[in-house]
């Protein structure tokens, strides 16, 4: 297995080291190439994602990312120039966000044992394509636009991914949108679900407005199995999903090219947390769960399940003890 590793900034370096520790336990022939991308390189050279690095990254089976971001860089520079650029260049059209309540979780819904759903978010369209602008800036007549791009091709392939995933789970897909107001984009998404669902007669479907979905995710999260939604609504609902299941510190994610043409990227949802970087107290659990997602994406379901079982046992045994980054990685690796 050839793995491109982007530790990134802040605690990304520390948590990635623990994820690699776990991966190497299960994949002895793992070949890794590290890429220095993020705030440090940008501050030193002005480079964000050089063409040579992108071309080299394409030659790997998958990508493991730590975290990107630093107070020394203007907000938005790294996000647009590195993360979004990579997402579009590698056609990571599926953003996959599992949301499971683990034992010992600090979730406010910890008393509800059956929280286990996945959000499938479209990753390359919507209002995040940069299709907008502003005129008369600084005047009372300033106008700003952000155009949301929705295509049949983009919606259908993400919906198809969601149905295939649901068939391996509880066989239920919920489309989340705002079709009563966003009627043009909503029509594409609704027809995509109707079209693909005809090929999966054993998968039930449901629809939920985004505002109602935020209520149900708190009051009745077990109603969800696989959620499919667009880029903007997915961006919002996945953070709520993280809070419901104990916080984004435990949240793993995958940025996936479902066609397999490009390597997919896996990363913890949490940020670079520069305030605790270098102290050895960052929880690497989300990075380790991201490694499990990576293995499952590459067809190593058994190894992924072993990691998830070890993580579940580790979380259940922690109690109120303080997290030491390397010790968490050691315990989970030893449990394999």
UniProtKB/Swiss-Prot annotation:
It is found in: Cytoplasm. Mg(2+) binds at residues 211, 235, 239. One of its GO terms (biological process) is L-leucine biosynthetic process. Signal peptide: none annotated. Coiled coil: none annotated. One of its GO terms (cellular component) is cytoplasm. Keywords: Amino-acid biosynthesis, Branched-chain amino acid biosynthesis, Cytoplasm, Leucine biosynthesis, Magnesium, Manganese, Metal-binding, NAD, Oxidoreductase. One of its GO terms (molecular function) is NAD binding. Substrate binds at residues 87, 97, 121, 211. NAD(+) binds at residues 271-283. Belongs to the isocitrate and isopropylmalate dehydrogenases family. LeuB type 2 subfamily. This is 3-isopropylmalate dehydrogenase. It comes from Rhodococcus opacus (strain B4).
């Amino acid at each position: 297995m050839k793995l491109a590793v982007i530790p990134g900034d802040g605690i990304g370096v520390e948590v990635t080291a623990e994820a690699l520790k776990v991966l190497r336990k299960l994949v002895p022939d793992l070949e890794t190439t590290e890429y220095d991308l993020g705030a440090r390189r940008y501050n030193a050279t002005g480079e964000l994602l050089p063409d040579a690095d992108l071309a080299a990254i394409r030659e790997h089976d998958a990508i493991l990312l730590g975290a990107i971001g630093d107070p020394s860089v203007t907000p938005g520079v790294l996000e647009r120039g590195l993360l979004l650029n990579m997402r579009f260049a590698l056609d990571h059209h599926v953003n996959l966000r599992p949301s499971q309540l683990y034992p010992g979780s600090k979730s406010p819904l910890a008393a509800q044992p059956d929280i286990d759903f996945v959000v499938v978010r479209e990753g390359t369209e919507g209002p995040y394509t940069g299709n907008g602008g502003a005129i008369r800036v600084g005047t009372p007549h300033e106008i700003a636009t952000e155009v949301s791009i929705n295509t049949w091709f983009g919606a259908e392939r993400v919906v198809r991914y969601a149905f295939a995933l649901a068939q391996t789970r509880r066989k239920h897909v919920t489309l989340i949108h705002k079709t009563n107001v966003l009627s043009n984009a909503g029509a594409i998404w609704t027809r995509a679900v109707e079209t693909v669902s005809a090929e999966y007669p054993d998968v039930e479907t449901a629809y939920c407005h985004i505002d109602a979905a935020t209520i149900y995710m708190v009051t009745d999260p077990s109603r969800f199995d696989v959620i499919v939604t667009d880029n903007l609504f997915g961006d919002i609902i996945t953070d709520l999903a993280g809070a419901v299941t104990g916080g984004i510190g435990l949240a793993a994610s995958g940025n996936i090219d479902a066609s397999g043409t490009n390597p997919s990227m896996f990363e913890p949802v949490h940020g670079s947390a520069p305030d605790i970087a270098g102290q050895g107290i960052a929880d690497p659990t989300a990075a380790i769960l991201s490694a499990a997602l990576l293995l499952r994406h590459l067809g190593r379901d058994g190894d992924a399940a072993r990691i998830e079982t070890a993580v579940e046992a580790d979380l259940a045994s922690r109690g109120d003890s303080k997290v030491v980054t390397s010790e968490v990685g050691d315990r989970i690796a030893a449990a394999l």
